[in-house]
Amino acid sequence: MRILIVDDSAFMRKLLSDLFTGEKDFVVVDTARNGKEAVEKTKLLQPDLVTLDVEMPIMDGLEALRLIMQETPTPVMMVSSLTKAGADATMRALDLGAVDFIAKTNGPISSIQDIRQEILAKAREAVRVNVRRLTRPQTAPITQRSVLPFGGGVQGTDKIIAIGTSTGGPRALQEIITRLPKNLPCGVLIVQHMPPGFTRSLAERLNSLSDVQVKEAEPNEPIRPGWVYIAPGDHHMRVERNGGQKILRLTQDPLIGGHRPAVDPMFDSVAQTYGKQTVAVLLTGMGHDGAQGMKKIKENHGFTIAEDQSTSVVFGMPKSAIELGVVDRVVPLQAVAAEIIKAVSL
């Protein structure tokens, strides 16, 4: 796999190049110092993957990404700083077609080395992505958004919608959450594999585009109808009963399958607290997080939905649940919101 590394810092170019050195399946074909060089070298070299810094002189990473996706569609993995501005820019990059991102550490070299395997895994997954699927997500115009009718047995927060996703998730979530109506009679819980800070930017972006209220979850917060709660980076999110309420519990328990937040503990907890009132969804993502949790939801007679292969950026997490035989409906991304609304209305 041929990689082009783009960063205005010579130190970061060498650090990232060294990460891939010694891996038999990677070859760093060249490096670039700014977005202009990145666009030119992507055209010339036709790499399998581009790692692209966000903040650069002459042309920044976002403009370079836009041109690359327009002129030479190629899998791109952003390299972002751990700042609010960096997280916001990363959300825009994922919207423009970046496959994934690496959170650039401000610490010692060892900090990058600590996540070496994660970077390599992301890179191996990114090169297999069909970038034609990374067209801009469709945000439903207000006039076309669903209006969920009350009735059909829907009662307050008796039901819960639980969604798990990873690679490609922010774009998939935008497709779904913007189609949920303001009068949604239950809460929505989301686990998106993402570091601290980035989940807040994701929540803010979705909130600005949606009729429902979207926020990063807070400790011991009660679940309210019409609200969407995104698990904060580096925290597992579970549901617990607290008297007559159901509240969100955030913990820093050990990583599960290399993830925190992970989908499985969230799914496990809703299976226990909501049982058959659960509507669970697995979207695009690498690995198998969420499959076992979805199995528990199914065992408790909840309703389960998985995104199909045709629209998944990475068909890993949904595939794992489908292979376990615990999915009621397998549908393309564009049909997921309608399936959710139908299930909540039953």
Regions found by a protein language model. Give the residues of each.
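Conserved acid/base catalytic micro-environments in cytosolic active-site loops
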Residues: 2, 10-21, 25, 31, ...
